[in-house]
Regions:
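Bacterial Sec-dependent N-terminal signal peptides
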Residues: 1-25, 372-378
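Hydrophobic membrane-targeting alpha-helices
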Residues: 13-21, 286, 314-317, 366
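A short, structured loop/turn motif at beta-sheet edges
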Residues: 24-26, 57-62, 116-121
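A general structural signal for short secondary-structure junctions and capping/turn motifs
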Residues: 25, 44-45, 184-186
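Glycine-rich catalytic cores of cysteine/serine-nucleophile enzymes that process amide/ester linkages
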Residues: 28-108
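Extracellular structured ligand-interaction cores
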Residues: 50, 63, 112-114, 150, ...
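A cross-kingdom signal targeting lumenal/periplasmic-facing segments of multi-pass membrane
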Residues: 72, 76-147, 151-161
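Activation targets extended, charge/polar-rich intrinsically disordered C-terminal tails
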Residues: 131-312, 322-325, 329, 333-378
């Protein structure tokens, strides 16, 4: 407890000192303000890259990076707050060399785009950043699409400039889901997991910048006061060949083998566990849709596949002929057909198709078993 209080006190003292210090610093004409775009990595937190702001002034010996992607793992109820959308993210600063050392260690690319701003706006942005750090204005509730390290950098720059100089310039009819999907290539179960946990919001056409690499491309087209906002070529500060991860289990083959064994073995206990797992995941989706502040999780039509009613099939799977289980199976099959109609033009249709087939096969068997008009041994 004493260590925690000491750390908080030290941090507040540092931030207050930083604000006071920055207000006394007058940036020189040699000041450069740039946006750093960090390439993707193979860890879950790095799959989409990262955005940060760099302010460098040789005259005042400043070379600092402002990073809006920090959070505290020691936050009480971390997992529940993250799920609910109540987890606070915040900005921190790094010496530029330390920032680069981290990405050198992770073998991730870093690109730099210098903003063509007059000195007074450079000073204003510098002051705004430090005031936000010390006042707590840099603390924000993370939202996957609407509020993240990229959108926060865009917001503070546009606020400083007094106009939406940085906005989506590239034209595309892609949905948020379609944009995100390729980022999970070579990470099969992450791709599958995000495909089924995201709801209808991510099927909307993307109308704003929310990813680092997207920001980098749009900056090339952005203007301010009838001039290009980035007038120099994008600099590559770090460049590494992409590392393609390999895993004996995190791939589509293990997924197909697993579902194939369920169908081929046709064991009562396995079928029961499958129905229970699918239904439980569906209950989780419904719960998150109401509980979570992450709008991306709301209105999740994937619950038609992960049908909570399947839990009843688990509970009474081995029962003798029950007419209501027959109708339950038919109703679940109807929901599955509706799901296919909704999903058929979505980017994640193929990845969930094996589960659709498995569900359909097991539900047909369940319906036949509990239809008194058909005598069949299963």
């Amino acid at each position: 407890m004493k260590i925690t209080i000491f750390k908080i006190t030290l941090l507040l003292t540092f931030l207050l000192g930083l604000e006071s210090y920055s207000q006394n610093i007058i940036l020189s004409e040699r000041t450069k303000i740039s946006i750093l775009t960090c390439g993707t990595g193979n860890e879950s937190y790095s799959l989409f890259g990262h955005t940060a702001l760099r302010i460098a002034d040789e005259t005042t010996y400043i070379d600092v990076v402002y990073n809006y992607g920090a959070f505290d793992f020691n936050t009480p109820n971390f997992v529940s707050k993250f799920a609910k959308g109540d987890l606070d993210y915040f900005a921190i600063t790094h010496p530029f060399n330390d920032f680069m050392a981290d990405y050198t260690y992770e073998h991730r690319n870093v690109y730099e785009q210098e903003l063509a701003l007059p000195l007074d706006l450079k000073q204003k942005l510098f002051d705004n950043l430090n005031t936000a750090l010390s006042s707590g204005e840099s603390v924000y509730r993370y939202k996957f699409i609407d509020k993240n390290c990229t959108t926060m950098v865009i917001d503070i720059i546009n606020t400083t400039l007094g106009e939406a100089a940085i906005s989506k310039k590239t034209t595309s009819e892609l949905t948020y889901r379609s944009i995100l999907y390729p980022y999970f290539d070579n990470h099969f179960y992450e791709q599958l997991g995000t495909s089924i946990i995201f709801g209808s919001k991510v099927d909307a056409i993307s109308d704003h910048i929310f990813l680092p690499l997207d920001l980098m491309e749009n900056l090339k087209l952005s203007t301010f006061r009838n001039q290009k906002l980035v007038q120099t070529e994008t600099k590559t500060l770090l460049n590494y060949a992409p590392l393609v991860p390999s895993s004996w289990w995190n791939n589509g083959y293990s997924y197909l083998i697993f579902l194939g064994l369920i169908v081929i073995l046709n064991l009562k206990i396995i079928n029961q566990i499958y129905f229970f797992s699918m239904g439980t995941i569906g209950v989780l989706f419904v719960f998150l849709g109401f509980y979570s502040g992450h709008l991306e999780l709301a209105n999740n039509y994937n619950v038609l596949l992960f049908n909570p009613l399947l839990i009843l099939s688990f509970c009474f799977y081995g029962a003798t002929q029950r007419k209501w289980l027959y109708y339950l199976a038919l109703f679940s099959l109807l929901l599955l057909v509706i799901y296919i109609v909704i999903l058929i033009n979505k980017v994640h249709f193929l990845i969930v198709l094996p589960m659709i087939f498995t569900n359909g096969y097991l539900l047909v068997k369940l319906a036949l078993k509990h239809n008194k008009r058909i005598s069949i041994i299963i």
